Regions:
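Short, membrane-interfacial amphipathic segments enriched in basic
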Residues: 24-69, 246-247, 251
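Active-site cofactor/substrate anionic-group-binding motifs, chiefly glycine-
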Residues: 74-130, 134
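Selective transmembrane-helix segments that form parts of the transport pathway or gating/packing helices
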Residues: 79, 83, 87, 126, ...
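Generic alpha-helical transmembrane segments of integral inner-membrane proteins
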Residues: 88-95, 149, 179, 183, ...
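Membrane-interfacial helix-loop-helix connectors in multipass membrane proteins
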Residues: 100-123, 191-233, 237, 241-263, ...
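Hydrophobic alpha-helical transmembrane segments of multi-pass membrane transport proteins
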Residues: 114-157, 185, 242
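Short hydrophobic alpha-helical segments within the ABC transporter permease transmembrane module
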Residues: 118, 122, 162, 166-183, ...
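Short cytoplasmic-facing helical segments at TM-TM junctions of multi-pass membrane proteins
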Residues: 147-172, 254-257
Length: 288
């Protein structure tokens, strides 16, 4: 009798524990809108904080002091440091473009149009977009990790204590350098891509240098050049401001620095691609 009583008591205790761990469905359902509301408010506040920080950085460009040595150093990091990957990517993409387009033009006996297609594709779209993605992956992450490390080690707080504006000292040189260097890197990418396309066209299609380069240059007009140089300026501004924002708003120590680095690359790349679409629509409307 005692054995049955002890078994019943054990089963009752087990049932009580299961009931205590089970969450009521009503409370889970009622908390979901609250959680979504908190997430939405947090994201809206982050976007607002980003725009305020970017506006402060742009405002600093029109008043002294200017940290020109820091700006030149950042231009070297962003521009010269990115040249190898820009050149390699340009050669590869230019050659692949010729291979893909030539196969279609050969069906109609119009292989001479290869130069036109490669030139327009590189200058209008691929040059600015691919350059922005490469610079974002290399430099937005570097800005976020560098500034995030300074925040974690309290160097930014020490800078404020000494009366130095961190936005003017740290963010403004990076923004200026990136806005100036991304268009130049895009020009390098376009030229190297055309060179890579010519190498492939001359070996596989037997196109002469005069024929290829004449068609490639004549295919472009002023609208294509403006479109190819306007996009990189906007992309450079996005890359620099997002990278600096993610770095200056690091929380959570060294783990936060790692998260900020990843976030900077993802957000800047996605924003560049989204803005690319709307800029293309606007510029095509203006120059067609």
């Amino acid at each position: 009798m005692s054995r049955y009583a002890s078994g019943d008591s054990a089963q009752a205790a087990h049932s009580a524990r299961r009931a205590s761990h089970k969450m009521p469905e009503g409370s889970a359902t009622s908390s979901l809108p609250t959680i979504l509301g908190e997430v939405l408010k947090r994201e809206v506040a982050a976007v607002q904080d980003y725009w305020l920080l970017s506006a402060q950085a742009l405002q600093c460009m029109f008043s002294a002091p200017y940290y020109w040595l820091d700006t030149l150093e950042q231009m070297d990091i962003v521009g010269v440091g990115s040249l190898p990957i820009i050149i390699l990517a340009g050669l590869s993409i230019g050659g692949v473009l010729v291979l893909q387009t030539a196969a279609q033009f050969q069906r109609f006996g119009e292989t001479a149009l290869t130069g036109d297609a490669v030139s327009l594709a590189l200058v209008r779209e691929l040059g600015p977009a691919v350059t922005a993605l490469l610079v974002s992956g290399r430099n937005a992450s570097g800005m976020a990790s560098e500034l995030g490390s300074m925040v974690v080690t309290e160097q930014v707080d020490a800078m404020r204590a000494l009366g130095t504006d961190p936005i003017r000292k740290l963010m403004m040189p990076r923004v200026i350098a990136t806005v100036l260097m991304v268009p130049l890197l895009t020009v390098v990418f376009d030229f190297v891509g055309l060179c890579g396309g010519f190498l492939v066209a001359s070996t596989t299609l037997r196109l002469g240098a005069v024929q290829f380069w004449t068609r490639a240059i004549n295919a472009l007009d002023i609208g294509d050049v403006v479109q190819g140089l306007t996009k990189p300026v906007v992309f450079g501004l996005i890359i620099a401001t997002v990278g600096c924002y993610c770095g200056l708003r690091v929380k959570g120590g060294t783990q936060g620095v790692g998260r900020a680095t990843t976030t900077a690359v993802v957000i800047s790349s996605v924003c560049a691609l989204i803005v690319d679409f709307f800029l293309s629509r606007l510029l095509l409307y203006l120059f067609q």
